[in-house]
């Protein structure tokens, strides 16, 4: 939403899920009337309502190893808003291969983390976290819970990373892993 409000010209969104009532406490881009609707369509409608001059392109698909390179090729900056380790490593690996800058973020309960990768300017996600943790070593967001405001805080910071990169202003979180606790 903040990218649309900032006037970022073209925004791509990939997700195969539909809006569920359980999403609404943390995904405020959707509302109760969107339950059952494709998440990408709901998000597009909200962003276009905020700024009708923004072009929102939707991809109703899960991102996988077969689709990711085609999905990211036309974008200047990639934002990882996923909630699982395999997807985070896939996005990292594709962006490193394609020499695409991206913002990683992760949240759980009251905590979040964020880092930005720019080719040639700092470590990537896999450089910091060599491999995904063993299965069941870390609870999923569904198991542990997520406080909706945490997603808002970290998502806003990711939007600012994208805006700073696009405008070429300020210092990005390259070479840093920002951790944040709301407690």
Put a short name on every predicted segment.
Residues 1-183:
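Adenine nucleotide-associated cytosolic modules
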């Amino acid at each position: 939403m903040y990218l649309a409000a900032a006037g970022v010209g073209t925004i791509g969104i990939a997700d195969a899920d539909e809006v569920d009532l359980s999403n609404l406490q943390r995904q405020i881009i959707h509302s109760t009337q969107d339950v059952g609707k494709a998440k990408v369509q709901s998000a597009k409608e909200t962003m276009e309502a905020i700024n009708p001059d923004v072009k929102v392109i939707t991809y109703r698909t899960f991102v996988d190893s077969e689709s990711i390179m085609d999905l990211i090729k036309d974008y200047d900056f990639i934002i990882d808003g996923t909630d699982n380790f395999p997807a985070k490593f896939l996005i990292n690996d594709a962006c490193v291969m394609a020499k695409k800058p991206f913002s990683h973020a992760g949240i759980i309960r009251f905590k979040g983390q964020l880092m930005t990768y720019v080719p040639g300017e700092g470590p990537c996600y896999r450089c910091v976290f060599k491999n995904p943790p063993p299965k069941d070593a870390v609870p999923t967001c569904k198991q542990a819970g997520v406080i909706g405001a945490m997603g808002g805080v970290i998502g806003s910071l990711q939007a600012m990373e994208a805006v700073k990169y696009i405008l070429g202003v300020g210092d990005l979180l390259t070479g840093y892993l920002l951790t944040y606790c709301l407690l």
